[in-house]
Design a protein with these regions (language model features):
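Short linker/helix segments within small regulatory modules
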Residues: 124-133
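Short metal-binding segments enriched for Cys and/or His
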Residues: 142-148
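Cys/His-rich metal-chelating microdomains
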Residues: 121-124, 138-141
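Flanking scaffold residues of small Cys/His-coordinated metal-binding clusters
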Residues: 110-113, 130
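Basic, alpha-helical nucleic-acid-binding regions used in initiation and control of genome expression
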Residues: 118
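Acidic, turn-prone loop/beta-hairpin segments
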Residues: 1-43, 47-67, 91-94, 98-106, ...
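A glycine-rich helix N-cap at a beta->alpha junction
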Residues: 78-92
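Short cysteine-rich clusters marking metal-coordination/redox-active sites
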Residues: 115, 135-138
Length: 148
């Protein structure tokens, strides 16, 4: 129970307004990452047209960037990049000798085995016979759910 007036349906309720964004640095970081994602999506679509990949999860994205603000940002969020780009793997090459601000993006077909649950391509699947065909991440997620 929540005090106060309510609409007839939750779908008619209004979201509370926010005066200011609390962490402007975080917002700036994610805006830059979304710009990179736009470039990655263009490269993915090009390789899809060339029939190199089918879905984006069937791809490995290789990014080469200079050692600077963008390079540091990509390194900081490295573990989240495959989920952000919806690909199986991201290979990051930060080059201190590269003076160009250009981002080099290369898309290749992913190798390895396809997880039956998340459809990512991984080097090996779990060895647990009760979770056959799953990557370790999915096997762990199912174990957490069962034991919770």
């Amino acid at each position: 129970y929540l005090p106060g007036e309510r609409s007839a349906s939750v779908h008619l309720e209004k979201f509370p307004s926010v005066d200011t964004f609390i962490d402007s640095e975080l917002l700036n970081n994610w805006n830059q990452l979304l710009e990179v994602r736009t470039e990655v999506n263009i490269a993915l679509e090009e390789q899809r047209k060339n029939k190199v990949i089918g879905t984006s999860l069937g791809a490995v994205v290789k990014i080469k960037a200079q050692e600077g603000l963008l390079g540091k940002l990509l390194t900081q969020y490295y573990k989240q990049l495959p989920m952000l780009f919806i690909v199986s793997e991201v290979v990051l090459n930060i080059d201190s000798k590269n003076k160009s601000d250009d981002l080099k993006i290369q898309v290749e077909r992913a190798t390895g085995m396809k997880c039956e649950r998340c459809w990512r391509y991984v080097p090996t699947l779990t060895s647990d016979p009760n979770k056959e065909g799953l990557c370790n991440r999915c096997a762990d997620a199912l174990t957490e759910t069962v034991s919770s």
